[in-house]
Amino acid sequence: EDESTVLVDNKCQCVRITSRIIRDPDNPSEDIVERNIRIIVPLNTRENISDPTSPLRTEFKYNLANLCKKCDPTEIELDNQVFTASQSNICPDDDYSETCYTYDRNKCYTTLVPITHRGGTRMVKATLTPDSCYPD
């Protein structure tokens, strides 16, 4: 009965929202929904997390309605047929890019860095999250 349900676990914006049903302390014959919102503010992150030379981020914005959208497609079965559906009808366009405040460890991030070798300098792609970029 004390189990929490994870509503949002957004690693990109460091937010986790859980929900659980508890007894109303003011009226023990009723249940209420308790929501817990955990936001970890990564203080030493960059404006552009893929560019280690960009300035430190000083502004963090969170929109609860956007965080709670369930836009990832999921498969459901109706009348012995499998359909792909989204749990929200207000999902952003495909070109929408969420602002990430830290690395999503499931994504591969790279950046170009200057490498000097034998008197010449050239730009080389460097991996910022190696575990996500290279298969096991």
From Swiss-Prot:
Keyword tags: Disulfide bond, Glycoprotein, Secreted
GO biological process per UniProt: humoral immune response
Glycan attachment sites: N48
Disulfide bonds: C12-C100, C71-C91, C108-C133
Principal subcellular localization: secreted
Pfam families the UniProt entry points to: Ig_J_chain
Gene Ontology CC, one term: secretory IgA immunoglobulin complex
Signal sequence region: none
GO MF, any single term: immunoglobulin receptor binding
UniProt superkingdom: Eukaryota
Compartments (UniProt record): Secreted
Keyword Cell membrane part of the UniProt annotation: no
Assembly behavior: Part of the secretory IgA (sIgA) complex that consists of two, four or five IgA monomers, and two additional non-Ig polypeptides, namely the JCHAIN and the secretory component (the proteolytic product of PIGR). Part of the secretory IgM (sIgM) complex that consist of five IgM monomers, and two additional non-Ig polypeptides, namely the JCHAIN and the secretory component (the proteolytic product of PIGR). JCHAIN-containing IgM interacts (via CH4 domain) with FCRM (via Ig-like domain).
Entry function: Serves to link two monomer units of either IgM or IgA. In the case of IgM, the J chain-joined dimer is a nucleating unit for the IgM pentamer, and in the case of IgA it induces dimers and/or larger polymers. It also helps to bind these immunoglobulins to secretory component.
Name of the protein in question: Immunoglobulin J chain
